[in-house]
Amino acid sequence: VDWVTEDCKSHFSGFSDNLIVTPEIAYQNLPEFKSCKGKTLMLIGGGPSANNDWEQNEYDFLWSINHFFRNEKLKDKKVDLAMIMGEPDIEAADFIDYRDKHQTMIGFEIHDRWLNYKFDNYDKYFCMHTRFYGRLGAGARMKIFAAHLGFKNVLFTGFDGPEAIFEGDHAFEP
């Protein structure tokens, strides 16, 4: 049963023409995703532990989320893939400068914000959506995505629960 194709196409007409759809997840099949199989991913969330010492870990790919490009540890590193939820301004100069400099793959989930949104012509946009939207945080959904792409290991930090962020202890935003 195809539970998501129509929504992907209505939200992301420019980057939903080559979807992989399973019972759990749907995503635009970018050629870059083939190189993930058997590799190690470092996934950085916005919680306070993202500011801890994680750089000593060995990894092949670096992923993050939302305002990652404002973090002191990430702003000069190449993040290979970032999922952007409803909050970030993707027309802001600091976002566009980072994205263009590092050629980061930028992913979006189905959300009202993106319906009828006029995306620019950046060629590394993709859509990804799981059946677990709204039940799990974005980091957990990114781990599901990583599993579907065949990563052998997923290391992560910055997923400290909502309490720290509600208290204002966020690694990506002051």
Region locations from a protein language model:
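Metal-ion/cofactor- or nucleotide/acyl-coenzyme-handling active-site neighborhoods
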Residues: 1-174
